[in-house]
A protein has these predicted regions:
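Acidic, surface-exposed loops and disordered segments
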Residues: 2-5, 9-186
Length: 186
């Protein structure tokens, strides 16, 4: 057997690099925190594009990709949102807020669409973290006023807002329940 290959046509170095990247993903999952206080620094357009690209690659049932995004960057719109959102300070001070909507016409099953949008949101949070940014997912926002401010279409339903920016500080990790409390094996 060829020493450059590892059981097939995949060079061993590529397998090692893949394992290294996987460790980066696992590290990002463990280190990511919800950031609620931001520095005023703007987000570079290429970083924002990378975050949206990561969101686009989330899994969805039947590949329906039911998510749509409205990127709120203007101070005026952030102030307007801040007047109607409970977490107003985060929305006002984060340089970017991404509204994540469900396109009701694109999906095939509401529950599966919402699950897919959850995966999409996790991609946004992890991508932001990996780029040195912080983010926080704001739920409980099914508010017609918010949908009007962001210009949601008739077939779109607001699922969440995600505020993104450079963290003013990185909070310490919160305790997690042990797997023994969360997992049953049968």
């Amino acid at each position: 057997p060829n020493p450059e290959n590892s059981g097939g046509n995949i060079p061993a170095i590529m397998i090692a690099r893949k394992e290294e990247r996987m460790n980066e993903v696992l590290r990002a999952i463990r280190e990511r925190r919800s950031i609620r206080v931001f520095r005023p620094d703007p987000i570079e357009p290429e970083k924002l594009e990378a975050i949206l690209e990561a969101a686009r690659w989330a899994p969805s049932g039947r590949n329906t990709q039911p998510w749509r995004f409205v990127v709120v960057e203007s101070q005026e719109k952030r102030e307007e949102l801040g007047r109607v959102v409970t977490q107003m300070d985060m929305v006002r001070t984060a340089p970017v807020t991404i509204a994540v909507l469900r396109d009701k016409d694109a999906g095939y099953d509401e529950t599966k669409d919402i699950q897919a949008i959850g995966a999409c949101a996790q991609n946004i949070l992890l991508a932001a973290h990996s780029l040195g940014l912080g983010a926080c997912w704001l739920g409980r926002l099914r508010d017609p006023q918010v949908e009007k401010i962001i210009g949601a279409k008739e077939n779109e339903e607001l699922m969440m807002l995600i505020v993104i920016g450079y963290p003013r500080e990185r909070p310490a990790p919160k305790e997690r329940k042990p797997l023994s409390e969360l997992v049953r094996r049968i």
